[in-house]
Amino acid sequence: MARPSLPCAVVAVLLLALLPTPSTAGDPDLLQDICVADLTSAVKVNGFACKAAVTEDDFYFKGLAAAGNTNNTYGSVVTGANVEKLPGLNTLGVSMSRIDYAPGGLNPPHTHPRATEMVFVLQGTLDVGFITTANKLYTKTISAGDVFVFPRGLLHFQKNNGDTPAAVISAFNSQLPGTQSLAMTLFAASPEVPDGVLTKAFQVGTKEVEKIKSRLAPKKR
């Protein structure tokens, strides 16, 4: 199978980057042409300090070209192209990622606290959705060439219900959008969320909570 082309995804992220940015949304405005992230700097700022020696490679990343390995519990994998992988994104307020899904694969419910996400489907068919603060679910089945938007901070998911692999390119209006998985946040936090909080919140017993925690606990090597 020929590898899907990316032009439409590139157009999508460029359009997102060109949208007017209110002072309350996305990352802060840049104050110079470039500020390539110094990922080794001990200076703590809202973002990353600028490094002095800059090269073309600071603005280049080829990690989205190939499909990721979906051989895991959820049958999906996210390959990020954020400031940690592409230092030239520092202060520019955009990033991307590629998400690959095995047949039946799920990108489980999660949020991006610092960014709105827009996905462009490269191949396959996905059931996607997000939930508002009023507990209203908006869901849609999307296929190759389609675009869907997940508003900033809202819980959302993607599920491949097809019998062939699927893939999307995601665009974000943040250099580092952050990801908070609902299940991992509640049941695999360190230190642990007290059982009493979870049993009362989910109206289940301690045994059920401990069972979920054991399944989500990091695997020992």
Swiss-Prot record:
* Chain residues that bind Mn(2+): 110, 112, 117, 156
User: Which Gene Ontology BP annotations are present?
Assistant: plasmodesmata-mediated intercellular transport; regulation of root development
Residues annotated as glycosylated are 71
Signal peptide start and end residues: 1-25
Name the UniProt key words of this record, in alphabetical order: Apoplast, Disulfide bond, Glycoprotein, Manganese, Metal-binding, Secreted, Signal
InterPro entries, per the entry: Cupin_1 (IPR006045), Germin (IPR001929), Germin_Mn-BS (IPR019780), RmlC-like_jellyroll (IPR014710), RmlC_Cupin_sf (IPR011051)
Report the subcellular localization. Secreted, Extracellular space, Apoplast
Start and end residues of each Cupin type-1 domain: 62-210
Mainly resides where? Answer: secreted
GO CC terms: apoplast; plasmodesma
Q: Which GO terms describe its molecular function?
A: manganese ion binding
Annotated disulfide bonds:
35-50
Q: Which family does the similarity line name?
A: Belongs to the germin family.
Note the subunit structure. Answer: Oligomer (believed to be a pentamer but probably hexamer).
Function statement:
May play a role in plant defense. Probably has no oxalate oxidase activity even if the active site is conserved.
Q: What is this protein called?
A: Germin-like protein 5-1
Organism in which the protein naturally occurs = Oryza sativa subsp. japonica (Rice)
